[in-house]
Design a protein with these regions (language model features):
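Hydrophobic helical membrane-anchoring modules
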Residues: 2-4, 8, 220-240
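N-terminal glycine-rich phosphate-binding loop and ensuing alpha1 helix
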Residues: 13-71
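Residue-level signal for inorganic ion chemistry
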Residues: 23, 48, 103, 117-118, ...
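Short active-site oxyanion
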Residues: 60-65, 87, 140, 219-220
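Short, high-confidence coil segments that cap the C-terminus of an alpha-helix
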Residues: 61, 111, 138-141, 209, ...
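Acidic helix N-cap motif at the loop->helix transition within catalytic regions
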Residues: 73-79
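Short phosphate-binding loop-to-helix
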Residues: 81-113, 195
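Conserved core of the sugar-phosphate nucleotidyltransferase
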Residues: 123-214
Length: 240
């Protein structure tokens, strides 16, 4: 039995680590046709508030930092004033990786695990959060994902160059959860290497670390277009 197996076994029997959340809502919503997706309303409340409320009421999450645009810091602070787990609302950086790093810096010293969440995934559930946090507690890094339904093509110059086996493909969602020190180190290395990363898992993967995949939720969509927003509203109506 190797040391990694022993370490993972010990993690599984220890109490759940103190987990903070960084909710990233600092984008400019360029694909939303003039709609500010951070403040877009779903069932009468801004999308960021709905996302934050789910983390506020999830037992696995102990504290929250929200990262947003400078013009939204005060409005979001007021909207989330009732959420006692929200410890800070901070201004984001030039890109997602920098914004996540700024959020990590605002967490308390108690935090050992961190869940990084897209603010634009307002239909996240306690079940997915809890499942991912527990997997990260055991493995050090975890993310929810769902199987890809469409056939995916790799295209170069407008011509198909290959077709990956669909059975090996998963669409990764958030929250992506990590040991805090692991994610900090991974983001720093990506920054030092000037590497382009598309999500937080990518930074960790670059260091040769494995990310545990857990069952995601088809309804945990990311709202990036007006059509996505319309679908999110329909899904919420369906819940009533």
């Amino acid at each position: 039995m190797d040391i990694t197996t022993v370490s993972n076994g010990l993690r599984k029997v220890l109490p759940l680590k103190y987990c903070g959340a960084v909710i990233v809502a600092a984008g400019n919503a360029s694909r939303m046709g003039g709609i500010d997706k951070v403040m877009a309303e779903l069932n009468g409340e801004p999308m960021i508030v709905r996302t934050a409320r789910t983390f506020q009421t999830c037992e696995a999450i102990r504290e929250i930092v929200i990262v947003t645009r400078e013009d939204l810091v005060m409005p979001i602070m007021k909207l989330c004033a009732e959420f006692d787990k929200v410890k800070a609302v901070v201004v984001g950086g030039a890109d997602r990786a920098e914004s996540v790093g700024l959020g990590l810096g605002a967490l308390s010293e108690k935090v050992k695990l961190v869940a990084v969440q897209d603010g634009a995934r307002p239909l996240i559930t306690h079940e997915v959060i809890d499942r991912t946090v527990r997997a990260a507690h055991s493995y050090g890094a975890a993310a929810p994902a769902i199987p890809v339904k469409d056939t995916i093509k790799v295209v170069n110059g407008g011509v198909v160059s290959s077709t990956p086996d669909r059975k090996t493909l998963q669409a990764v969602q958030t929250p992506q959860v990590f040991d805090l020190d692991l994610l900090k180190g991974a983001l720093k290395k990506a920054f030092d290497d000037k590497a382009e990363i598309t999500d937080d898992c990518s930074a960790v993967e670059r260091m040769g670390m494995s990310v545990k995949i857990v069952e995601g939720d088809e309804k945990n969509i990311k709202v990036t277009t007006p059509l996505d927003l319309a679908i999110a509203k329909l899904l919420l109506e369906e819940k009533k």
